[in-house]
Amino acid sequence: MPAGAPSPARRRASVRADQRVERMLGALAATVLVLIAAMIATVFVKAWPSFSHNGLAWFGPGGDVDEQLRAMAEQSPVSGHSIYYFRAWSLIWGTLVTTVLAVIIALVVSLLAAIFLTEFAPAPMRRILEPVIRLLAAVPSVVYGLIGILAIAPYINEHLISNARKHSVGYVVQLNGADLATATVILAVMITPIMVALIAAALATVPRSWREGSVALGVNRWRTIVRVSLRTARPAIVAATVLATARALGEAIMLSMVSGGRGFGANPLDGVTFFFEPVRPLAATIVQNAEGLSIPALGHTMYAVAAVLLVSAAMLSFAGWAAKQPLKRYGIRA
């Protein structure tokens, strides 16, 4: 046996120790998967009564969703009869419009900010901005909600919504600054730091030789950024967009504070007024009705809302995976 080599007994002990660690880690991973599966199963089982009573009409329009939720909440928890009538379209529409608008705004701002950080910002400025961006990404959503109701909503109410506009729709809905515009702006501000951090990190990994080669061929700097840097970073851009969209879909506390809290289907045909109309996204609906979960019909309905959010997140993840697959044809790792 070579000098200093471990003895066979020591090697066997080391192998057994490694196997024990692997089994322990495998058991922990399996436990996590079982817990996640149990949580998902619980949500869908508790959501089933709401879906079974309403069918596919659950996802459609029909009546005032606030009145429907109020009718459920006013039932006695021990009542033998439950009212399950529910039409979630206005909540689904509120979720879609706030999420899509916020992600579009955040994507444009994030791309420009990431390009500035990696291509134009001096090193001292970059060393200051990068920690600030990470800090903004970690700010609790309730802080953004406070900024929305204390600063953004009053400003919109006083300076952007005229009295004539308020009176023109006053018989239908009250315009007070807690609306689609405020929710979209604050939500975009919330998800932008996440996207900037991910996209900037991807742009920073683009080989410098690729950019220098493009410039050497006579391509100007902006065209090099678009054709070389952004194209190479496409997987990260897709991943950042998916992650930010998932964050926007699941945001509850902030949106419950600034969106207006009404199940009102904001109508794009109303023109500019559309942006000043209140909305209520799905996640915010759960927060606003959390105290009534002990009431059977309301509790099952909120679980149904949670199930829709879970399915939406799963579909979003699959869409992100599918969007990145064509990039592999060009040798881009996704």
Segments predicted by a language model, with ranges:
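Membrane-interfacial helix termini and adjacent extracytoplasmic/periplasmic loops
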Residues: 45, 53-89, 145-189, 259-260, ...
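Periplasmic/extracellular loop-to-transmembrane helix junction in inner-membrane transport proteins
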Residues: 8-24, 44-102, 122, 288-299
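Transmembrane alpha-helix signature in integral membrane proteins
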Residues: 85-116, 241, 309
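Transmembrane alpha-helices
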Residues: 135, 139, 195-206, 219-259
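Non-cytoplasmic
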Residues: 146, 154-156, 237-275, 283
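Transmembrane alpha-helical segments of polytopic membrane transport and secretion proteins
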Residues: 1-29, 320-334
